[in-house]
């Protein structure tokens, strides 16, 4: 996407100007952390966080933290199986998809996941290994976005790039397994972009760090001051 070219230039410039810490709250699949490494940040300069189970399994695997700390439980899987990151991701993917089993595509994919379970797990392990080879050395915590941001607001050498949900309870809806997989979820508030983006900008208005935030909105209605924009539809 064109915004990634812009961000890459921005990140490269920030490094030249003395920024030594990169934060990715709402990390998702760690797209910004990958971009930070591509742009010149070292993994040990990167901090990522999220409140979702999926991202936390990935984050713990990449950073070498034991999954015991996440207290994972999943219908149809033993607790011991879930100590393996690739199996835990497989369980999440399977149970997340199962909520849509009434639709042909999802039903057929679930059958494929069952029949080729070991192949799917092997593929997930390979993905995790690739991510670890790039991001190994970074830090990850299951942590609320607001708490993570507050830690570095007064750090003039920190760069934050946040990409919060684009609709209310976006993460919750996407990552929902209907209770079939549970974990030691951190405390956090539901993010509603209608009010949350305004709160975000108000919170960082006097920050000493450099803060960038994704926002999806109509021209003239943004919470922050746009420095890059592109037309897009969902």
List the predicted regions and their residue ranges.
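Active-site segment flanking the S-adenosylmethionine/decSAM binding pocket
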Residues: 141-194
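Short amphipathic alpha-helix with an adjacent loop that forms part of the alpha/beta core around
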Residues: 12-15, 75, 148-155
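Class I S-adenosyl-L-methionine-dependent methyltransferase module
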Residues: 45-137, 167-179, 183-186
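Conserved proline-anchored active-site loop of SAM-dependent methyltransferases
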Residues: 22-36, 48-53, 154-174
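Conserved Class I SAM-dependent methyltransferase catalytic core
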Residues: 193-234
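Class I SAM-dependent methyltransferase Rossmann-like catalytic core
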Residues: 1-16
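Well-ordered, non-membrane alpha-helical segments in soluble/globular domains
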Residues: 4-8, 116-124, 182-201
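Conserved S-adenosyl-L-methionine
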Residues: 38-45
């Amino acid at each position: 996407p064109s915004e990634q070219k812009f961000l890459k230039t921005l990140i490269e410039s920030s490094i030249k100007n003395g920024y030594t810490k990169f934060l990715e709250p709402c990390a998702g699949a760690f797209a910004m952390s990958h971009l930070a490494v591509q742009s010149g940040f070292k993994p040990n300069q990167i901090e990522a966080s999220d409140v979702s189970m999926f991202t936390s399994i990935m984050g713990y695997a990449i950073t070498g933290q034991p999954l015991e700390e996440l207290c994972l439980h999943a219908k149809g899987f033993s607790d011991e199986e879930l100590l393996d990151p690739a199996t835990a991701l497989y369980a999440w993917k399977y149970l997340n998809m199962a909520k849509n089993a009434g639709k042909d595509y999802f039903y057929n994919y679930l059958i494929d996941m069952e029949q080729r379970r070991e192949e799917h797990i092997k593929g997930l392990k390979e993905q995790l290994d690739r991510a670890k080879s790039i991001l190994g050395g970074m830090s990850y915590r299951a942590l609320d976005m607001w708490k993570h941001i507050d830690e570095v607001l007064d750090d003039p050498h920190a760069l934050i790039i946040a990409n919060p949900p684009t609709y209310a309870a976006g993460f919750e809806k996407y990552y929902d397994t209907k209770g079939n997989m549970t974990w030691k979820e951190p405390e956090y508030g539901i993010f509603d972009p209608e009010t949350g983006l305004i709160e975000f900008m108000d919170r960082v208005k006097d920050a000493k760090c450099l803060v960038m935030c994704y926002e999806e909105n109509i021209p003239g209605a943004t919470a922050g001051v746009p420095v890059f924009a592109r037309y897009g539809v969902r």
